[in-house]
Structures are given as structure tokens and as C-alpha cells.
Amino acid sequence: EDVEALAAVEDEDEDARKAAQVKARAVWCRTMARLSMLRDQPHDFKVAVIDTVDALEAGCHAYCCIRDKQDRIGAPTKLYGYGEGYKIAVDEWRNFEALCQALKRRRGMTVVLVSHSTALKVKDATMADHEKQGMKLHKLAAEFLCDQADAVFYCHKDHLIWTDGDGERARMKIQQKPRTLCQTRLGDGWEAKNRLFLPDPLPVFSFAGYQEAAREGLKIRDRVFAHLDTLDPAERFAAELRLDACGWAVGEAAAIVGDANITAPVGATATETTNENKEIST
């Protein structure tokens, strides 16, 4: 019922769309109320999952439009200048994210936001224009939520790519494998990140496996930052640049701390592919 209400916001019929806005706004309000309840009332829950956050975006937009007496979030008006509605919506996402952070800090909960992906056009001065997979949200909302998240993963089916034939008859073929890979670091074709020293990709994604690996990764991160605190500002800046450049690879952490015993988090060992398409063992 909630999903249908959120989807109907795009209805072309004005009366139907306004009725759908009211229902979609109610979905947003219920979601915020439930997160507030988890924050304020005693309970034993350890994980909260929003599935999907791109569907919930319609509720956020409907909430803003009804509150501000606007027709559409993207329609230019005296209050909502061109594109301003989406900026106003980000303020509501900030309230949403503040509740998620409160669950993490006050209740020790993990909050998981699930989103469909979509192809995003990327203009980069260092390479040709290309597309990558990112969250199926408005650009401003996606950037905000990705910035605030501890980890952003892109999951997709593993596949083989090969060329069949020669010359003009050559054709690229793709065979999909049954297993799902979980990309944990930024790639040319997807948006992802983590600061938990996870290998990229995770060979099989499971939430239990991630939690175990994350706990080990946090221990590694604590050791790295304890070491960084002993460095002078110039050395620390250089070390942080090295970490960012390698996507927080565990091998770089071992090199910075000077401890070869630092290894990949338990349950998350995999073969990593660097930006130079070389394989390193973790």
C-alpha cells in the first residue's frame, strides 16, 4: 500500500496526483515517527532497514510540497525557484539522517538504506565522459546520503566478458554468474565507499558477514588513527592521502602502521583489483 501511494505521486491527473501526495506524505511521516519511536522508547532491535529509500523520496517531496503549498517539488514558483525545491527537500533528508545517527549513537543500532541503482552521467577532466551506477535519487539527496553514510556498497551479479570472433565479426559477449558481488570502493562504473578496510569486492554479501567484518575493520581503523595521532601534520596529511587514494585498503593500513600482522577482516577475505587492474592478495 505504501509503495503504491509513493509511486502514484507521478500520476498525470491532477486530482489523482494531489490525493497521492497526501498518502505519500503520510508514508514519510509514519517513517519518521517509527524512527523516532526506535530512538526514544526501549526495545531490543539492532537493525533498522529502509527498503527502498528511492521510493521513500516521493514521500519526502510530497511532505515538502504540502507543507509549503507547492504543486510539484521541481516546479519553479516564487517560493521554489528553479531547482530550489530539491534543495529544500535535502533539509528534510537531514532530519531523517539525524534520526538514523541517533539510532546509531544512542541505541547502538545499524541503519541500512536500500536503493535501486541508476546510470549517472559523469564528466571528469581526467578521463572521457562516462556513466556509473549510483543511487536512484535526486542528485542532491544522493550526494548528501552517500556523504553521511559510513559505507556505501554497490551489489551486482558477477559476470564473464569475452570477445567472440575476429575482425569485423568480433562481438563482445557477457555471461552472468549466479553469485552476487558487493563493491566496497569507488570504481569507474559505480559509486561505493567504506572506511572499514574491507576488501573490494566482497565475494558474497550477507549482512551477518558484513557486521563481523565491520567489527574487525573498526579495530583496524582505531589502530590506524592511533598511529596517525603520533605523526606531525605534514606526515599525517600524506598518510591520509595514501589511504584515500587506495580506497582504505588493508595493505596500506599495514604499511602506514608498520605492522605486517594487520590483515583483512575475518570473513571478508577476497582478491582485490586495484585501479591499475592488478590483483593483490589480502
Predicted regions span which residues?
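Conserved inter-motif catalytic segment of the P-loop NTP-binding fold
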Residues: 1-94
